[in-house]
Design a protein with these regions (language model features):
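Helix-coil boundary and N-terminal low-complexity module in membrane systems
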Residues: 1-156, 194-200, 207-210, 214-223, ...
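Membrane-interface alpha-helices
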Residues: 97-98, 117, 168-201, 284-305
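Intrinsically disordered, low-complexity segments used as extracellular stalks/linkers
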Residues: 303-315
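Intrinsically disordered cytoplasmic terminal tails of membrane proteins
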Residues: 317-324
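Internal active-site segments that recognize and position negatively charged phosphoryl groups
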Residues: 139-179
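Short, flexible loop/turn segments with low-complexity composition
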Residues: 131-132, 304, 321
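Generic N-terminal initiation segments characterized by hydrophobic and/or small/turn-forming residues
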Residues: 1, 6, 175-178, 319
């Protein structure tokens, strides 16, 4: 798929036209100050990932074979008496219940898929970042704790507010969940650096965890005295604990902090696909491919870069090598 020409994109101003353009072909992210376009670009990425997946047989085979094996196992688990309708019900319950295990079972396959998709996205080739099965299990458990307990105090306080409390609690909970949908996708699409021995975006942020805190851990830095300090002490302690648990994903969170509108669009687009039962097993590889495209353009983007001046072929830090 050839990257979209910038002058062609500049002529498309409506959101639906932008969405079709961004979902139709790999395109660099808009400038940071273009918040609406950045949101639409992020929203279109899962659709772009799905388009790339179905158009390239090598990616489709890698994505579907493990899923078919997973479905076959669920069919065997659901096997039993009680008639056809009971078997169908047991099968779908087994499939839906086991779906959260797919990031663990398919972690290495997703990593290879993300690396193999890069040339199809106009990005320089990279080697996959392969985790051990133990790493995948530990990271999944920690992420589950962070996801479940991260905003529990805020949700609890919100429910105490009359009338609108439950609404605010739901908004906080869903916002936190969508945040971690993006984090998990970016983490699954991580690749090894282009140069052996070089640090990637995640390793750079992991060097000084106490000096490079994620946004949700910043309350621990509050310097308050008197009653205010006593009242906020539990929140500061909670933020510190949460920051330690989330330190592994500091690089992915930094991309969200740097490009919040892109992240918001990507989260919404991914959530819409993942909300479809059973089919979300097939959509998840598309989201990994989409995250690979996002990382290709944003992982090495400077923190203070005012505008996006990337080339329209290749990867920002490797375009010279690609053009040679």
């Amino acid at each position: 798929i050839a990257p979209l020409e910038p002058e062609t994109l500049a002529q498309r101003t409506k959101a639906d036209e932008l969405l079709r353009a961004y979902a139709g072909t790999p395109t660099p992210a808009p400038a940071r100050e273009l918040q609406g376009a950045s949101f639409v670009w992020g929203l279109a990425q899962p659709l772009l990932g799905l388009r790339v997946l179905v158009r390239h047989q090598d990616l489709l085979v890698r994505a579907t074979l493990p899923v078919l094996g997973f479905v076959a196992v669920c069919l065997l688990v659901a096997e039993g008496g009680g008639g056809f309708l009971s078997w169908i019900g047991a099968y779908y319950l087994t499939l839906i219940g086991a779906a959260p295990l797919s990031p663990i079972l398919f972690a290495r396959n997703y990593a290879r898929l993300a690396a193999e998709a890069r040339p199809h996205l106009g990005l320089a080739p990279r080697e996959p970042y392969l985790r051990t099965f133990r790493q995948s299990i530990v990271e999944a458990i920690v992420q589950l704790i962070v996801l479940g307990a991260g905003v529990a105090p805020l949700v609890g306080l919100a429910t105490l507010i009359p009338w609108v409390g439950p609404i605010w609690a739901a908004v906080i909970g869903w916002g936190w969940a969508l945040h971690w949908v993006v984090v998990e996708a970016l983490d699954s699409a991580r690749t090894l650096p282009a140069t052996p021995g070089e640090q990637d975006f995640a390793e750079r942020h992991a060097e000084f965890p106490e000096l490079d805190l994620p946004w949700f851990a910043l309350p621990q830095l509050w310097q308050l005295r008197g009653p205010a300090g006593a009242i906020t002490a539990p929140l500061r302690w909670w933020a510190k604990w949460l920051g330690r648990l989330g330190a592994h994903w500091r690089g992915e969170i930094a991309i969200i902090e740097k490009r919040p509108w892109v992240a918001a669009g990507f989260a919404l687009g991914s959530a819409l696909l993942l909300a479809i039962p059973v089919l979300n097993l097939l959509f998840r590889p598309a989201i990994v491919i989409a995250a690979s495209h996002v990382l290709g353009w944003l992982e090495d983007e400077p923190e203070g870069e005012p505008e996006h001046e990337h080339e329209h072929e290749g990867e920002p830090n490797e375009r010279a090598a690609l053009s040679a």
